[in-house]
Amino acid sequence: MYRFAPSPTGDMHIGNLRAAIFNYICSLQDKSGFILRIEDTDKERNIQGKEKDILEILSKFGIKPQQIYIQSENLKFHRQLASKLLIDKKAFACFCTEEELEAKKQKAKEEGVAYRYDGTCERLSDAEVLACDKPFVIRMKKPERTMSFTDAIKGELSFEPDAVDSFVIMRTDKTPTYNFACAVDDMLEGVTFVIRGEDHVSNTPKQDLIREGLGYTGKMNYAHLPILLNIEGKKMSKRENESSVKWLFEQGFLPEAIANYLILLGNKTPSEIFTIDEAVKWFDITKISRSPARFDVKKLEQINREHIKLASDDRIAEVFGMDKNLANLVRFYTQESSLVPEIKEKVNKIFAPKVAPEEYKSEFETIKNAAKNLGEFENFDDFKKALMTATGLKGKNFFMPLRALLTGDLHGPELSELYPLIKGDLARIIA
């Protein structure tokens, strides 16, 4: 069972989307199932409506979870299992205040050593714990051995006990920390394979330790994806527009193209242009590069152009909000632009009322009136010759206003290539 577990705390990041796509593809390959879990336990950072945004984005990519879980609905289980860890002496109550811990961290910093919890509260007797009425957190006991796991991308990874440390699993308000809620939920929901960003590598031994402490014996597999870099080679910040899936949609990138590019990054693929369904046939999570990949919007634009060309007439009509009879005209304009709004603007200009260019006002009106009285011509050369004869215009004084009449612009693609696509609508275009 695979899962995608986003938090409703902001717009979806392309790194998160990449993980969702990879999990979904792998679930289709081995038919083991795919679930969505909304990790909403951080009430202060949650943003209302983001759960709906997550579902809508996944739907645009054709990602269909078999089950949707809300993490906060598992709170009673988190508390029950934290109590079990306390009873079994796998965890302990910690009464250290933030000020006390901060002082110890500062001392470690001054001494040039990594801070580790010193076990103060772990040594308290049951009687001392019961006698203390201070607020407390629950900490998982530091492991007594090296924690190791095999990563499908990075290989064998090991963490010494001090690197895992005695970490907090329940806060003073009796809500679970990320690692505890995540470990418990994966166990309860039958997750067996986790594909996520490499920023979670250090969380993995902690989550394994929690499940081990609870007596869970199910095998968990992992694949941690290298981070995505911006074009300058720096880690992509959530503040960068390109990192937001919502922003990419607003710019006019198709979900098909975004998915294609995210699968392509740091991967060896049999072709450069493909769909998620096609990727299911050959995708191999173990072949993802261990090195970070650069996210290049210009490359994404090229891929977007190809997906617009390949889209069905019905898909183009849906995306562009146009009659599907204009699909070939949309494809034609991919030679000038790769983004939906820009192409849409160019096509709409053809059918919009035209304004005569200031420098060609007279010629524009002459050509317009003459064109209204001409019949339909099969090819551009015959149309051009007939219009030249009717107006007596030639050269720049003919072609510039003619282009303005047909396209609404003074510059653009070859009219001889455009004409076959619009000849049936000339009466409407020049009206």
From Swiss-Prot:
Its EC number is 6.1.1.17. This is Glutamate--tRNA ligase 1. Coiled coil: none annotated. One of its GO terms (molecular function) is tRNA binding. It is found in: Cytoplasm. PANTHER family: GLUTAMATE--TRNA LIGASE, GLUTAMATE--TRNA LIGASE, MITOCHONDRIAL-RELATED. Catalyzes the attachment of glutamate to tRNA(Glu) in a two-step reaction: glutamate is first activated by ATP to form Glu-AMP and then transferred to the acceptor end of tRNA(Glu). It catalyses: tRNA(Glu) + L-glutamate + ATP = L-glutamyl-tRNA(Glu) + AMP + diphosphate. A motif ('HIGH' region) lies at residues 6-16.
